[in-house]
């Protein structure tokens, strides 16, 4: 009887172990098929604060008056070309980070008082998107962002003015893509 009980116990343990391995294998296989959680989302409340919305749009309006190059748009249809809707927030994260690091921070002593309020707000959005990544091919995104960066660099200070003058478009595009 004891031998039969031991035999059943080993058989049961073997079945249990095999079942666990099967479950782990199925879980791992399913995990490969699921997209990685990208955390590419912003809360709508970020875009519903009248004061900062007003300051952002006022900064863009003030600076756009100094923009002499009205033939070029940095944020528009071309920027989103070839980028699926689900990846547009990641694209806008890249544009936001470039705008902050290469345009706004070097120009932060200008266009006061708006700049001192808008830069921390946009930095907060950038921090909220810090874990935003895509798991697929980002070739079109990188190409479009590279084109935007090259345009700003080619235009020099005029390109920086244009980027600041389009902060309203950046704001709206972030809201549309990330909320």
UniProtKB/Swiss-Prot annotation:
The entry's keywords: Cytokine, Disulfide bond, Glycoprotein, Secreted, Signal
UniProt GO cellular component terms: extracellular space
PROSITE patterns, A to Z: INTERLEUKIN_10
SUPFAM superfamilies membership: 4-helical cytokines
Cellular localisation: Secreted
Record-linked InterPro entries: 4_helix_cytokine-like_core, IL-10_CS, IL-22
Entry-listed glycosylation sites: 54, 68, 97
Function: Cytokine that contributes to the inflammatory response in vivo.
Designated name of the protein: Interleukin-22b
Source organism of the structure: Mus musculus
């Amino acid at each position: 009887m004891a031998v039969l009980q031991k035999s059943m116990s080993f058989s049961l343990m073997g079945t249990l172990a095999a079942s666990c391995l099967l479950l782990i294998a199925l879980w791992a296989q399913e995990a490969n098929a699921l997209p990685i959680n990208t955390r590419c989302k912003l809360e709508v409340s970020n875009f519903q604060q009248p004061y900062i919305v007003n300051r952002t749009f006022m900064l863009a309006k003030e600076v756009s008056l100094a923009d002499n190059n009205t033939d070029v748009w940095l944020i528009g249809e071309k920027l989103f070309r070839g980028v699926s809707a689900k990846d547009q927030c990641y694209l806008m994260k890249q544009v936001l980070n470039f705008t902050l690091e290469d345009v706004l921070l070097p120009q932060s002593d200008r266009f006061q008082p708006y700049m001192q309020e808008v830069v921390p707000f946009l930095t907060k959005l950038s921090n909220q998107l810090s874990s935003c990544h895509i798991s697929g091919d980002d070739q079109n995104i990188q190409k479009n962002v590279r084109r935007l960066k090259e345009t700003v660099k080619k235009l020099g200070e005029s390109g920086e003015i244009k980027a600041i003058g389009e902060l309203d478009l950046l704001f709206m595009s972030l809201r549309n893509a990330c909320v």
